[in-house]
């Protein structure tokens, strides 16, 4: 059989964005091609061996709720699991997993190779076929022309990638992989705003040369958490500990005395690095008053001695890297397996994208991941899933979809990017979401799985499990509501004694659960029955205890919904709207917001300007009605 020359969707790149994009498109029944420069690196964790964390796990759970692969692969490859912020409220709790790189990558590849409607082909993409402002396909490195209705670019750090170690640099997409030069040049010819960003990675250490006895052990949680809504702890490989050590005055002295050899501080690197994952050079420069910084020693896997020293990312020369590492307690005799480095790469201003992640100037061309200025596997995976979904919807002739800010962290991520743009690598935090009590990691499936089913992203097995869970939550809430406890009875006295809360009158169990001192597990232990599914029990408890706050947020969302959903015509001429300042006209003209809500979040666009836009829309609507009736 000849290799197909036409697909409905082509995805370029096999990293975290590309794999989720290709899988999403194929799950929707669309003929999809995943082009990668190397099949062996599909799903590769290029930087730290971890998935999740504050804000990030919310994205992973949302990807999972929509049928994506990241959470399931984490459960199969995770060698340590912890819940961060476990003593805080449910809105900011976050699951984080250390992952075995080999196992994680194998899980992703297995998923890809067993996905119907998905073809995988090892070829670099050198060019796009664009006709009349519409993408028509791609041209590969060996000159193959492959056509498609939509193309999703998930190029990571490969576009014009330049690797720096000290004052030396060379072209590369990441260590050991070639960059994408021809495609980068082609994209720069398009009417899109382009910039340069930078990221980095620390040297890798041979664990046999490390003294763990002087470090602080950091074991995983017990019982072991799971990442996927369909996951279970039986899927997990053997679990291991991480370790904590610290930099010291000697470490900082070594770095400070060698800043003139840093490509970042000597002006060689032009790209801006990630604010929330700075290099060790950046840390000692920005936080000069700090005497030490934590270094988390993270195992890379079960079948390797390599360690990832999280916290000392650097692009200093190798001889300086060795001095830095060996100045840290427990690593005095450490052997470096791979040097750390920084990498500069092209990214494109995400304000040139629609909510669907389709470019505004080239129809059918979608961007996802680091090409949009983000950093992190989770942010990339979320964008990939959304871009792949919308590429498939376009091929099917259906309307595009993007969750709102009050529906998902994916919605927050995309809205931030296309409205505000970014001058530095963008990372997700719970603090970026104004409705975070509703957007918890534990209820991502309740928020999104039904929509995923409607879109064609969710298979029968996941849908059946979700429906069972949702029904169980409703049944347990009804049971608690209809079960009463009276003062003076054995159960009433037991509750009063256990919780130190005497009952003054008859209560149903749901009322009792609203009290801060009463938890679900203890209440059920006294009253009997109850739910054995921990996911169901968690939902019942959180929904009950925070019902007042949740209702308040829902009311606020309902009030804002009208303006949020009001569409702004694509052909609107902001310069013709009387009363708008030149500055606001310019900002609206550059961003071209899709809705009134998006316009209101553009920096410098005032409430008065939004009122003028509303008046203009009403006049425009009235004028069109008169034309139609004439």
From Swiss-Prot:
Cofactor: FAD
A Pfam family of this chain: GIDA_C_1st
GO BP terms: tRNA methylation; tRNA wobble uridine modification
Location of this chain's protein in the cell: Cytoplasm
Binding, FAD: 13-18
Cited InterPro entries: FAD/NAD-bd_sf, GIDA_C_N, MnmG, MnmG-rel, MnmG-rel_CS, MnmG_C, MnmG_C_subdom, MnmG_C_subdom_sf
Entry keywords, A to Z: Cytoplasm, FAD, Flavoprotein, NAD, tRNA processing
One of the record's GO cellular component terms: cytosol
GO molecular function, one term: flavin adenine dinucleotide binding
Origin: domain of life: Bacteria
Signal peptide per UniProt: none
Record-linked Gene3D superfamilies: FAD/NAD(P)-binding domain, GidA associated domain, C-terminal subdomain, tRNA uridine 5-carboxymethylaminomethyl modification enzyme MnmG/GidA
Binding residues annotated for NAD(+), in chain numbering: 273-287
Subunit structure: Homodimer. Heterotetramer of two MnmE and two MnmG subunits.
Record HAMAP family: MnmG_GidA
Protein role: NAD-binding protein involved in the addition of a carboxymethylaminomethyl (cmnm) group at the wobble position (U34) of certain tRNAs, forming tRNA-cmnm(5)s(2)U34.
Similarity field: Belongs to the MnmG family.
Protein known as: tRNA uridine 5-carboxymethylaminomethyl modification enzyme MnmG
Origin species: Pseudomonas savastanoi pv. phaseolicola (strain 1448A / Race 6) (Pseudomonas syringae pv. phaseolicola (strain 1448A / Race 6))
Gene: mnmG
